[in-house]
């Protein structure tokens, strides 16, 4: 079982007298920066010269600098730009501005685990990864609560890397909920597997296959969408709130019986074998290599083509029309 840490295990005073540069001001960046600021930490924000987020940073009471300048000013650098942009940004703006004793931080292990970023030996390399979207990290903090987070230490040059990870996690509010210790490798491999086999790849293909099966059998696309796609949120919310037991308690006995007798016909031994292959391709770096090549290709043509093809599926058109009926979805 994972070991849990809380605010009582963290020493936020370790961050006193240090400057934290949060690189990026998107979903996670704005939450980290504002939470740290409200925790009394000296925070600056690093952005590209052309970033449109500078005004928002200033409106939030923070100071924005070009990424290279922010990195040079900082003792702790948290990189919160998309994975595919991190390596180039690191080489162009951060690497030459690192000093011995600095702390380099990430919220996902991809670029360290797959050696797209190789920091010098005299800096700490740490992960602090909240297990929730940035707006939740921020809103929970403001309400006096927090979102659980993972911490990991890849390189402990200072001898205090774990303590710094805990301090930072506490500063963004994670210590109020719970902090779990992991490794860069474990976080990276499980995160990628969960996305590909279950949360994104697995779920979308399952919903799409169900929709297509009903439509091919002559059922109305709108009914197929309701039964195979729209109602997914109802089930996931129940599981999120109380696990499979809560979900099964809340659904009809007919649905529960169908769960038991049919689920294993859909997720078969062959499916599990394929899942193991997917995991192996993540572990041995095959997936990462393919994704890195894709991002280096001009225009990311294959990726854009797949995105376009999926956007043209019938379920997208049907769903868009049905969502017009749902007043609670309208902002």
Curated annotation (Swiss-Prot):
Residues annotated for Mg(2+) 1 binding in this entry: 191, 195
Reaction catalysis annotation: (2R)-2,3-dihydroxy-3-methylbutanoate + NADP(+) = (2S)-2-acetolactate + NADPH + H(+); (2R,3R)-2,3-dihydroxy-3-methylpentanoate + NADP(+) = (S)-2-ethyl-2-hydroxy-3-oxobutanoate + NADPH + H(+)
UniProtKB keywords: Amino-acid biosynthesis, Branched-chain amino acid biosynthesis, Magnesium, Metal-binding, NADP, Oxidoreductase
Positions with a binding annotation for NADP(+): 25-28, 51, 83-86, 134
Cofactor requirement: Mg(2+)
Stored Gene3D superfamilies: 6.10.240.10, NAD(P)-binding Rossmann-like Domain
Domain KARI N-terminal Rossmann residue range list: 2-182
SUPFAM superfamilies documented for this protein: 6-phosphogluconate dehydrogenase C-terminal domain-like, NAD(P)-binding Rossmann-fold domains
Note describing how the cofactor binds: Binds 2 magnesium ions per subunit.
EC number annotated for this UniProt entry: 1.1.1.86
Lineage: superkingdom: Bacteria
GO biological process: isoleucine biosynthetic process; L-valine biosynthetic process
Disulphide bonds in the chain: none
GO cellular component, one term: cytosol
Pathway linked to the protein: Amino-acid biosynthesis; L-isoleucine biosynthesis; L-isoleucine from 2-oxobutanoate: step 2/4; Amino-acid biosynthesis; L-valine biosynthesis; L-valine from pyruvate: step 2/4
Family indicated by similarity: Belongs to the ketol-acid reductoisomerase family.
NCBIfam families: ilvC, PRK05479.1, PRK13403.1
Protein name per its UniProtKB record: Ketol-acid reductoisomerase (NADP(+))
């Amino acid at each position: 079982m994972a070991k849990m840490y809380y605010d009582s295990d963290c020493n936020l005073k370790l961050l006193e007298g240090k400057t934290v540069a949060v690189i990026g001001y998107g979903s996670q960046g704005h939450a980290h920066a504002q939470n740290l600021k409200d925790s009394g930490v000296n925070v600056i924000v690093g952005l590209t010269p052309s970033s449109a987020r500078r005004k928002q940073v200033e409106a939030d009471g923070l100071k924005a600098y070009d990424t290279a300048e922010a990195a040079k000013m900082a003792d702790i650098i948290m990189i919160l730009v998309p994975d595919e942009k991190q390596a180039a940004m690191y080489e162009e703006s951060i690497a030459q501005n690192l000093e011995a004793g600095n702390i380099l931080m990430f919220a996902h292990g991809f670029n360290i685990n797959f050696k797209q970023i190789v920091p010098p030996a005299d800096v700490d390399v740490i992960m602090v990864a909240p297990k929730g979207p940035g707006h939740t990290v921020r809103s929970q903090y403001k309400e006096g609560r927090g979102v659980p987070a993972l911490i990991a230490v890849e390189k402990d040059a200072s001898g205090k890397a774990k303590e710094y990870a805990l301090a930072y996690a506490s500063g963004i509010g994670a210590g109020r909920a719970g902090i779990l210790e992991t490794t860069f490798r474990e976080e990276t491999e499980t995160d990628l597997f969960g996305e590909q086999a279950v949360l994104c790849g697995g779920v979308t293909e399952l919903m799409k296959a169900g929709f297509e099966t009903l439509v091919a059998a002559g059922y109305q696309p709108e009914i197929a969408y309701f039964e195979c796609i729209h109602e997914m949120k109802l089930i996931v919310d129940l599981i999120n709130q109380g696990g499979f037991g809560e979900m099964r308690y809340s659904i009809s006995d007919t649905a529960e019986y169908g769960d038991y007798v049919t689920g294993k016909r859909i997720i078969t031994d062959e499916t599990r074998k394929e899942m193991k292959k997917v995991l192996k391709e993540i572990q041995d770096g095959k997936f990462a290599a393919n994704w890195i090549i894709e991002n280096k290709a001009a225009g990311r043509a294959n990726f854009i083509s797949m995105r376009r093809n999926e956007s043209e599926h019938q379920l997208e058109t049907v769903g868009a029309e049905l969502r017009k009926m749902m007043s609670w979805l309208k902002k």
